[in-house]
Design a protein with these regions (language model features):
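Conserved donor NDP-sugar-binding/catalytic core segment of glycosyltransferases
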Residues: 95-127
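Short, acidic, metal-binding catalytic loop of nucleotide-sugar glycosyltransferases
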Residues: 22-31
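Short beta-strand/loop segment that forms part of the nucleotide-sugar
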Residues: 31-40, 60
Length: 246
């Protein structure tokens, strides 16, 4: 049986959640469970989630809004040995579970994520996607070189991050006080337990933020936020440059 619990934090994701849940229903092998943790959606997100509710797909309501809090709540309810954190607007390959289990079969690996290809209805954001791929490597090399050579790679939300449940709990999970770059913060904690690996497989994430900002502005904001984060600027300050676009 699969060991993977997939956790999806949601907030007003009615436009994409149904597609994502349909994709998860055809995974081979299937996930042990899918936990949808909603932060108070005001659209049809919760209704859509309940339509898919089953013995392996559960809907959880979070009293507190915020990805870190919602993902921690999902992790607390999860029964799998492995946790996979998935954004509602991200498409995954059918063998997602197998790739995750194979990656963590290496005991020297504490966590991992995928290569994110940013796509929209009419275009693929090759330039932005390439930068995000490279950022996984150059950000830790520049700002945490001692950890880079220990195996640190900085993963971000749309890369479908995964790790062992025990390592997640022992690392303290996501910091609820961090409103942005919470996955990167978790990488800093997980690398104390093993390498972080970006697997050579692609997931597709919505380009909705880039579509609103434009490629140049989006890349500039990503660079600015990443640079300030590397210098230790608080996530609370950085969040104001990364407004909600839904």
């Amino acid at each position: 049986m699969s060991r993977v619990s997939i956790i999806i934090p949601t907030l007003n994701e009615a436009k994409c959640l149904e597609r994502t849940l349909r994709q998860l229903s055809v995974l081979e092998p299937t996930a042990k469970e899918v936990l949808i943790v909603d932060g108070g959606s005001e659209d049809e997100t919760v209704a859509i989630a309940h339509r898919f509710s089953s013995s392996t797909i559960r809907v959880i309501s979070s009293d507190t809004r915020g990805r870190s809090v919602q993902m921690n709540q999902g992790a607390a309810a999860a029964t799998g040995d492995i946790l996979c954190f998935l954004h509602a607007d991200t498409s995954v390959p059918d063998d997602l579970v197998a790739v995750i289990e194979q990656t963590l079969a290496d005991k020297t690996v504490a966590g991992g994520g995928f290569i994110s290809l940013m796509t929209g209805e009419q275009t693929t954001r090759w330039g932005v996607s390439l930068h995000n791929y490279l950022k996984t490597y150059y950000a830790p090399l520049i700002f945490r070189p001692h950890l880079f050579f220990k195996g640190l790679r900085l993963l971000f939300g749309d890369q479908v991050m995964f790790c062992r449940h025990a390592d997640f709990l022992e690392s303290g999970g996501f910091d609820p006080a961090i409103p942005i770059l919470e996955e990167a913060d978790l990488c800093l904690k997980l690398v104390q337990r093993g390498k972080i690996r970006q697997v050579n497989r692609v997931v597709q994430s919505s380009d909705r933020r880039v579509a609103k900002w434009g490629s140049l502005k989006a890349t500039a904001i990503y660079l600015y936020i990443g640079f300030l984060w590397g210098l230790g600027v608080s996530g609370t300050y950085l969040k104001k440059f990364y407004e909600d676009i839904r």
